[in-house]
Amino acid sequence: VVFNTPGANANGVKELVLAGMLLASRDIVGGIEWVAKEKDQEDIDKLAEKQKKQFAGCEIMGKKLGIIGLGAIGAMVANAASALGMEVYGYDPYISIDAAWNLSRTIKHIKSLDEIYSQCDYITIHVPLLDSTKEMINKEALDKMKDGVVLLNFARDLLVDEDALIEALDSGKVKKYVTDFANHTVAGHKGILVTPHLGASTKESEDNCAVMAVKEIRDFLENGNIRNSVNFPNCSMGVCTGAGRVTICHKNIPGMLGAFTTVMGNAGVNISDMTNKGKGDYAYTMMDLESEATEEIVKALEAVDGVLKVRIIK
């Protein structure tokens, strides 16, 4: 069983997205570079007053932000941007109940990407890289966006067709592109702000990931529960209060539960509670028993065709 720690770095990424919007709205980087270049000028204070207008920009308050994907990160960005006075539009046809509950009531849930493209001044992407999302931001999508849009991508680099993006930047269709993924296409372009994959590079994110990983592994070892596995489904029966508990990793094929209950029946063991979850080719079964599990039961379960691993938890 392989675990991951989704959402542990969500706040770190959220803060970087907000910083990206601010940097794209006002030429803060250009201003800092100008001061560094002119640092030896005796009248730098007076020069600064004369030159500051070239670094002027706009405020994000009152602007429209479109968020594609309202998972852990997208939802946090939505709430924070709304608190900063932005008009936030969210698109996510697969939004979870937990994510929906965490969203501010001020967030407008949009049912079409075209609405995001046509209405929003800023668009940020927070979706996984799938066959269906690869290069979802292509020439067709870019053509539908408002002139002067700011596009942010802190999810996956391949979500954006970068050749089409460069054309849109050069034509002025896109004002700025902010991304966390450096490559030869985007690095050095005057309209692109690139960070070196800093999304989760905070002490807090690293600590959160470590704590979450320890909790997941401990719960699996002590109780047999699975949370946030890459290759197996989420499956939990809490803390075992019965006489025994057995967990079984097996192939996701018909007839497995019948075979397991037959083994228990032949051993004269009553099952007080049971759950089974499947994910792709694999499944996971947990059984609480009214008597302790024995090595004979384990051997009988392991002999069932399709069983990968049997563990006695208690």
Please tell me what each predicted stretch does.
Residues 1-8, 155, 197-199:
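Short beta->alpha connector loops at strand-helix junctions that form conserved
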Residues 5-64, 225-228:
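Phosphate-binding beta-alpha-beta segment of Rossmann-like dinucleotide-binding domains, i.e.
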Residues 14-33, 79-86, 212-225, 261-265, ...:
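Oxidoreductase and adenylate-handling cofactor-binding alpha/beta cores
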Residues 61-64, 139, 148, 243:
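Phosphate-coordination loops involved in phosphoryl transfer and adenosine-cofactor binding
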Residues 63, 70-71:
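Glycine-rich Rossmann-fold phosphate-binding loop(s) that bind the pyrophosphate
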Residues 74-75:
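N-terminal Rossmann-fold NAD(P) dinucleotide-binding loop
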Residues 93-185, 201:
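Rossmann-like adenosine-cofactor binding region
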Residues 177, 187-190, 198-314:
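NAD(P)-dependent dehydrogenase/reductase Rossmann-like domain
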